[in-house]
Structure formats: C-alpha cells, structure tokens
C-alpha cells in the first residue's frame, strides 16, 4: 500500500514532552529516539529548542524521518493498513502549521525521570532499580521545576513510563500531596503501572488525584501465573495482581492492558486478551506491542525474542496465535505488516 506521509500530520511532537533523567523527548523514545540533553538546554527552554523544532519540521515536511515507522503503532497502521488513527490525522484537517509552540509549554507531559520499580522485568532491566536518597531529591527537584515552568498550562500528566508511580517515593508523595491549585488547566492524569501496589488502601491515600485519573496503562505481559512470575515479571505475584485488577475495575477509569510480545509469552496472547476482557469488560483496550531492546539483551538474545520476525524458527506458531486475536474488539497493536489489507487476512 502506497501512502504519502506528506498528506498526514502527527500532533504528538507539537503538544507533548517526555522528561527523563537529564534528557527529554517529544514522543516515546522507541518510536522517535531523538533526544535533547538537559545539560545543554535547560528544562524551561527546551520545548521550542532547535532540536525539537527540527523534529517538528520533519513532520510538517512529510518525511517523518526521525520516526520509527515500524514500532509506532499509528504509523504502522497507516502505512500498512491505510488507516489514520490516534494522533495521526489528515494534514488538511489539522490546524498545525508551525514548528513553534506558542506558549512554549506542552499540553501533555510525561514524567519519566524515576526508574524505581519493585520488579526486574527482563524486557526493561537486568536488576532491581530503586532510587537512593540522592536520587529521590533529584526526582523531587524535577517535580519542583515542572511546577514552576509547566503547571499553569499542562492539560495531561503521564506518570510514569520509566518505573512505577506507586513504588517511586517521589511520584507516590507527589500523588498523595497533589495540589490542584498549581494546575489550573489540568484535565487528566494518566497512570502507567504494573498495578502491584494499586490497591484500595493506596488509592484512598491520594484523594486529590481521583477526579483527574481517567485513564491508566497496566503492563502485564502474561496470561498465566507461571509466565508472569518466572518469565516476564520477575518479583511479581500473580494473585496480588488479579486482586488489584479487580479493584481497579471498580473505578471509573479506562484501562489499557499492555502485553509486550516476545518468545516467552506469545502463546498466551489469546489467554491474556480473554482474561483482561473478563475483568474489565468494554472499558479495556488491550495492546500487543513488539518488544524493544532497552539495552538488556545482546544482539543474539534479542533476535531470539523477536518471534514476529519471519526468520524466527517459531514465526509460524506466532502467526497461528496472532490469527486467533487480531480481529477482536478493543484490541490494537503494531503488527500490521502481517495483515493483508485487501482481503483482511494474515500474510
């Protein structure tokens, strides 16, 4: 399918900022890896800085040259399936025409500057990562900077894609002591979590964020206890997870349940989908995404993980499993290259 990207626009680099430890991005780093070093450009000046303006120009000129068109599910869907979705839309319907953002602040702010987590998932890290007192102070200082530079205009806060918001001392205290007066234009908070600590007691300890938390992503990557505890979520407790998911299902929050597809779990894609739908019903969207190498695998190890690769010895089995689910409702993915757009069958 021939798609001319000059006819399309992606709004993400024009309204989003993702803050990591010492660096910033304007999209998910695996989808658009260009970064801005905060040691070179201070946080208060970063949003209309030259590197970010350059990224926006690559969207405006239709090249999308910095984007990973395979890993981004929206570009993958457009290029392989001919469907514009999410932040990607037809350019003529958009009012985006300049690489400069008027108020020099993002609408959508991703807080990814604390990697603290109680799990050591092989797809993310090789050991437990927990900030010490110095690291906690750094996290708190960055939150203070956000309060000073961005809080007046930001509309959505995303906490967090780097660790877990309930495990992180800095993020947990931020949620517990959240002051809405500092964020007059805030519409929503999106929580990204493994849900291991998201129980009623924890939720009741942060009442000021309740009306803002309208969406969440829960990263699970397994459909059975064995895979969850021994392969994809090392340190996890399956029964605790299920109990917390049932609690979360009682909240007025839309849920994205995510599953990173790899050699150790692809046989459970259908089981995972059915489990999530049985708990959350129609308010869940289930995402199946290709595993990304965040530096935890050697080249050879990562090749074995990529079960969707046509040269992988189990690729035919992956296709068989994917065929069971890809037409399901409330499901999205970045595996569109395996779908024949003419007769809507797997290639």
What are these regions (language model features)?
Residues 44-45, 54-56, 121, 125, ...:
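A generic structured-segment signal
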Residues 15, 70, 75-78, 82-83, ...:
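Preference for well-ordered, secondary-structure-rich cores of eukaryotic proteins
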Residues 1-134, 300-347:
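N-terminal pre-core extensions flanking Radical SAM catalytic domains
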Residues 47, 172-176, 229, 245-249, ...:
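Non-transmembrane alpha-helical segments in soluble domains
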Residues 105-116, 127-141, 153-169, 181-199, ...:
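Core AdoMet radical
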Residues 60, 145-152, 175-182, 205-209, ...:
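Leucine-rich repeat
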Residues 21, 156-158, 188-190, 211-220, ...:
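Conserved C-terminal portion of the radical SAM core fold
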Residues 169-177, 200-207, 268-272:
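Distinct, well-ordered alpha-helical segments
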């Amino acid at each position: 399918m021939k798609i001319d990207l000059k006819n399309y626009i992606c709004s993400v680099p024009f309204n989003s900022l993702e803050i990591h430890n010492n660096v910033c991005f304007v999209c998910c780093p695996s989808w658009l890896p260009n970064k801005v070093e905060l040691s070179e450009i201070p946080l208060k000046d970063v949003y209309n800085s030259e590197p970010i303006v350059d990224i926006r120009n690559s969207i405006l000129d239709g090249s999308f040259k910095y984007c990973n068109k395979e890993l981004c599910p929206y570009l993958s869907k457009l290029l392989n399936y001919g469907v514009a979705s999410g932040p990607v839309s037809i350019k003529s319907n958009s009012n985006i025409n300049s690489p400069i953002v008027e108020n020099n602040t993002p609408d959508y702010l991703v807080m990814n500057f604390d990697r603290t987590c109680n799990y050591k998932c092989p797809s993310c890290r090789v050991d437990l990562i927990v900030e010490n007192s110095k690291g906690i102070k750094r996290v708190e200082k960055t939150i203070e900077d956000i309060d000073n530079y961005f809080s007046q205009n930001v509309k959505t806060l995303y906490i967090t894609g780097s660790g877990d918001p309930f495990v992180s001392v800095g993020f947990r205290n931020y949620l517990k002591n959240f002051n809405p007066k500092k964020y007059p234009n805030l519409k929503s908070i999106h929580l990204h979590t493994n849900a291991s600590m998201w129980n009623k007691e924890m939720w009741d300890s942060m009442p000021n964020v309740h009306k803002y938390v309208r969406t969440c992503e829960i990263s699970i990557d397994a459909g059975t206890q064995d895979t969850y505890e021994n392969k994809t979520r090392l340190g996890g407790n399956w029964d605790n997870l299920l109990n917390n998911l049932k609690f979360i299902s009682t909240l007025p929050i839309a849920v994205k349940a995510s599953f990173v597809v790899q050699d150790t779990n692809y046989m459970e894609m259908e089981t995972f989908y059915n489990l999530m739908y049985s708990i959350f019903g129609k308010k869940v969207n289930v995402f199946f995404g290709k595993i990304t190498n965040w530096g935890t695998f050697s080249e050879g190890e990562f090749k074995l993980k990529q079960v969707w690769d046509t040269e992988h010895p189990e690729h035919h089995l992956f296709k068989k499993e994917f065929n069971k689910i890809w037409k399901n409702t409330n499901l999205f993915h970045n595996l569109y290259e395996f779908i024949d757009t003419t007769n809507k069958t797997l290639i």
